[in-house]
Regions:
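Glycine-rich segments within core transmembrane alpha-helices of 12-TM secondary carriers
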Residues: 59, 145-172, 193, 364-376
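Multi-pass alpha-helical transporter architecture, strongest
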Residues: 14, 192-205, 373, 395-424
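A membrane-interface helix-boundary motif in multi-pass transporters
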Residues: 173-191, 380-401
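Transmembrane alpha-helices of Major Facilitator/SLC transporters
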Residues: 66-68, 271-295, 306, 310
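Cytoplasmic helix-loop-helix junction between adjacent transmembrane helices
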Residues: 116-156
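Juxtamembrane intracellular "pre-TM" segments in multi-pass secondary transporters
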Residues: 1-3, 207-243, 261-262, 266, ...
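C-terminal ends and interior cores of transmembrane alpha-helices
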Residues: 91-108, 308-321
Length: 424
């Protein structure tokens, strides 16, 4: 019991299973509603555009509303109340995810779901929740173990997503209330979020590991001489993270729409399996980090390998027309989840522990702000190329990934040069 009280894995696991249930449920309800309300005489293109437009608005609200609350919660967390940036967003998840249950049970219009990201965002949303988790993990581990520890949290997140996605398609069809599917799935999501909230608020205890005083003093004296170098590295890491997140978020957002209509036209079960395939990447990325660490590869090299893996997979997705080729493209992205945890780990090694919350939240909010442009741009590009090459948007994603590799390469060269000077 004492071991569990100091671990965040139960919260991360249950919350991600609940999120997988919600995502699959929302995907299928949106598809069903627009199938009933949209004329599909033009080969399903009107339905496709309507679904893409819904998700564009939904994702923009998710990104915008959380900006100020997340920053305020990060400041509170850095003042010593480390659980607040995790607990408050879980309250928002619990309330906002319950809306899907009401939409299904009472046959409300699907536009009611726009209130979900608003309620969730006012409680900080993922922009507060995930940086809060990473800050707690970083504070409780040494620098040597931090990259692997953060990757373990990512692995837990991925395993939960894998299992949740596998089950979600079946749960969606398990019970129909007056011919309306998804009631069991929505209920399960709400119950799991309630369990997460109870664990985080009442059971979990913050365990902060303070570095030795002499180590802190040595780090401070080192920074006096290389302050400008550290600032440059932080800026480059932020730039690379933002570009890579734009590529991944934009590509995956459209991919969620792409699989629902022709040429794939997936069912609820296939959507669940597809999401599960995406979650397997967390496992392969974790194995990759373990393997590359044993081979003594640098952090920047591991990031570049992960980015190249995503680049090849998402480019191949441009030409996907069957379920089999979809899974081949997914297989190529087996290391795509390596970059973000390693970037966060590198950032944590550049700053003081008292700034973790603000730094990680600042990074997450940078993703949100960049996403304000990413979501409509990718959606408009997708809609405008539907008649010619529907997968062109994935080529755009691969180009942005290539750009993200440039600042990481610069950081790698600077770090190698600095280590060479230290040896001399």
């Amino acid at each position: 019991m004492a071991f569990l009280r100091s671990r965040l894995e139960p919260v991360v696991f249950c919350a991600q299973v609940a999120s997988s249930f919600f995502d699959t449920g929302l995907q299928m309800i949106v598809k069903q509603r627009y199938e009933n309300n949209t004329h599909t005489a033009a080969g399903g293109h009107n339905e496709q555009k309507s679904i893409a437009y819904f998700y564009m608005i939904f994702n923009i609200l998710t990104k915008v509303v959380a900006i100020i609350p997340a920053f305020l919660l990060a400041r509170i967390g850095d003042k010593g109340y480390r659980k607040v940036p995790v607990v408050v967003p879980l309250i928002g998840y619990f309330i906002s995810r319950g809306l899907l249950l009401f939409v299904i049970a009472f046959d409300w219009t699907i536009e009611v779901m726009y209130a979900s990201p608003i309620v969730n965002g006012l409680c900080g949303g993922f922009s507060s929740y995930w940086p809060g988790v990473i800050a707690l993990v970083s504070l409780s581990t040494s620098e040597e173990d931090r990259s692997l520890r953060i990757m373990c949290i990512e692995l837990t997140y991925g395993l939960a997503g894998f299992l949740g996605s596998l089950a979600s398609g079946h749960l969606f069809q398990l019970y129909a209330l007056e011919h309306r599917q998804g009631v069991v799935l929505a209920c399960a999501s709400v119950v799991l979020y309630f369990m997460c909230l109870g664990y985080a608020a009442c059971i979990f205890q913050v365990n902060t590991r303070r570095p030795p005083v002499e180590l802190d003093e040595r780090r401070e004296s080192d920074r006096v001489g290389i302050l400008s170098s550290i600032k440059s590295n932080v800026a480059l890491l932020f730039g690379a993270g933002i570009l890579y997140d734009m590529a991944v978020a934009g590509g995956v957002e459209i991919l969620n729409v792409y699989v629902l209509v022709e040429p794939l036209s997936w069912t609820a079960t296939q959507v669940g399996y597809g999401n599960a395939a995406g979650s397997v990447i967390f496992i392969t990325s974790f194995i990759g980090v373990k393997l590359f660490t044993r081979c003594s590869l640098s952090d920047t090299t591991m990031i570049l390998i992960g980015m190249f893996s995503f680049l090849t997979g998402i480019y191949f997705m441009t030409f996907v027309t069957t379920t089999a080729t979809y899974y081949i493209a997914r297989a190529l992205t087996l290391f795509a989840l390596i970059p973000m945890p390693i970037i966060r780990s590198l950032l944590s090694k550049q700053i003081r522990g008292s700034s973790y919350g603000r730094t990680f939240t600042g990074l997450q909010l940078s993703f949100q702000l960049a996403g304000l442009a990413t979501s409509p741009i990718f959606t408009k590009v997708y809609q405008s190329t539907l008649q010619t090459l529907p997968g062109f948007v994935f080529t755009l994603s691969s180009i942005i990934t290539l750009l993200a590799m440039i600042p990481i390469s610069i950081v790698g060269c600077r770090t190698a040069r600095q280590e060479g000077y230290e040896r001399l």
